[in-house]
Amino acid sequence: MGKIIGIDLGTTNSCVAIMEGNQVKVIENSEGARTTPSIIAYMDDNEVLVGAPAKRQSVTNPKNTLFAVKRLIGRRFEEKEVQKDIGLMPYSIIKADNGDAWVEAHGEKLAPPQVSAEVLRKMKKTAEDYLGEPVTEAVITVPAYFNDSQRQATKDAGRIAGLEVKRIINEPTAAALAFGLDKAEKGDRKIAVYDLGGGTFDVSIIEIADVDGEKQFEVLSTNGDTFLGGEDFDQRIIDYIIGEFKKEQGVDLSKDVLALQRLKEAAEKAKIELSSGQQTEINLPYITADASGPKHLNLKITRAKLEALVEDLVERTIEPCRIAIKDAGVKVSDIDDVILVGGQTRMPKVMEKVKEFFGKDPRRDVNPDEAVAVGAAIQGQVLSGDRKDVLLLDVTPLSLGIETLGGVMTKMINKNTTIPTKHSQVYSTADDNQGAVTIKVFQGEREMAAGNKLLGEFNLEGIPPAPRGVPQIEVTFDIDANGILHVGAKDKATGKENKITIKANSGLSEAEIEKMVKDAEANAAEDHKLRELAESRNQGDALVHSTKKALTEYGDKLEAGEKEKIEAALKELEDVLKNASSDKAAIDAKIETVATASQKLGEKMYADMQAQQAGAAGAAGAAAAEGAAQGGAQTADDVVDADFKEVKKD
């Protein structure tokens, strides 16, 4: 059985890790980095770039370079968060036929799971290159506050990437696993994981206990905001720069997608620099032009200014902390350790706020970029049966229920319930002789169903005619270890049953997923063909170069006919290499022709080299013989007799 890899599929960056024995290994990608930007670029020639190569070309290809797609995964187009992003993103966010938020690149409509699958495929390939064997199974992390649709969409992304997702695990829980197994402290500890990533914020209160030699990680509560993260911090800087430039130059950069992409890059860089320095300078020459000529942007930003710009964003993270503490039934003073996860937690203002709320310094010995992937790899080892000393008890982040008479949300499973869990309740009909009931399933904390997220609905038909309130319909909610909901309804009188895994009227259908899996496989085959073609072209170029060089040096030793034959074969190979539509077979055939025609040339080169070596060896032998004769004469004359006396210690 192959290894189960751990993948942190992040909004801004992603990371992959595996366990080797009891040691964790965060794997470097093909560019040599331990994290990969979650950026995907669709090129004109149908090539798809992922990670650093995609990021590098984003300024010149803003409409087809997709980033922060995780913010759209499992979301409806109408959601206010999606509407907010439409005005900010250089790429197009569109409404799919089923009402979901999709994106567009080169006129092609793409589902967020399909785009995220490209990042997962890169993570899979990174692990395969390191292990030297195929990888088919993974544990993928999601923000703890992700709802059912978002979890299901993440699982779909894994399938499209060719991975069997063994478990969806919450990011703060994964970070706690990485932290807890790394520490030797005995006894029970309560920790708070504050996870502020590129697009999402989570906080979880987790108890780590030693139970009969096994470390038990029990999530007591979780809270968060799935639309708050580093991207929002970047946006505040971008808005500030646009405002200042407009005041100074009278030009609005927000309408220029190329300028916006440069601003995004500069804002991210400035934010990072201000985590260590007090001031930074944003310098972007030729940012735009008007009738008076080119315009340059030069702006100084201080750390104090940045903190003023994002103060309310940092403040927004504190209320979820307060709720999580309350829901866990603990006091702030009960928290032993505070762990920071996510790149945005490197900002001094964030650390200061966290310290102020929890009353203690956050731990500095956890890598905020890698802890989540490490935790996922540990969970992968547990699921493969190779590790028995860890037990993980996670929770469902939001309450689940159904709509009952009057549009009320009747909760079946409350938030922060340990999963997996199952709950059944009996309901009845609202009208006389009602032959069918529609079960609408919602997720959220509001009293009225309409204020919560509709996960899906289904019908139970064939209920025998009876007065209202008489039929007994048992509704069962079952949440699996991935936090994904399965619902069933059963008429107790007839035994009629209807079960669904919540697939809202949103989300990808089975047929769509299958098509995307097939497309991905076809792309992989196409990529392989392109790589083989590139290798043949390289081989052809190298052969042309080496043969021409050999002809220059040894051509005069060939008969005229032989030389002409080689030159003709070379010309044919050069022509086929110049033709962009040449396939691998055509190039390989011409390579073979040149190789065959050059045999005589090779023989001449070989004979010449052997003659040179023989000449050199003869000269070296003569020199060695002369040296030996001189050495022999020296030996007799140059012997020095020496007296010596042995000194004995008493």
Swiss-Prot record:
Query: What Pfam families would the database entry show?
Result: HSP70
GO molecular function term, any single one: ATP binding
Q: Where is this region: Disordered?
A: 613-637
Record-linked InterPro entries: ATPase_NBD, Chaperone_DnaK, Heat_shock_70_CS, HSP70_C_sf, HSP70_peptide-bd_sf, Hsp_70_fam
Residue positions, PTM Phosphothreonine: 200
Induction summary: By stress conditions e.g. heat shock.
Provide the alphabetized UniProt keywords.
ATP-binding, Chaperone, Nucleotide-binding, Phosphoprotein, Stress response
- Look up the domain of life of the source: Bacteria
The record's annotation in PROSITE patterns points to: HSP70_1, HSP70_2, HSP70_3
> Does Transmembrane helix show up as a keyword for this record?
no
Q: Which CDD domains does this UniProt record tie to the protein?
A: ASKHA_NBD_HSP70_DnaK-like
The record, for NCBIfam families, names: PRK00290.1, PRK05183.1, prok_dnaK
Q: What is this protein called?
A: Chaperone protein DnaK
Gene responsible for this protein: dnaK
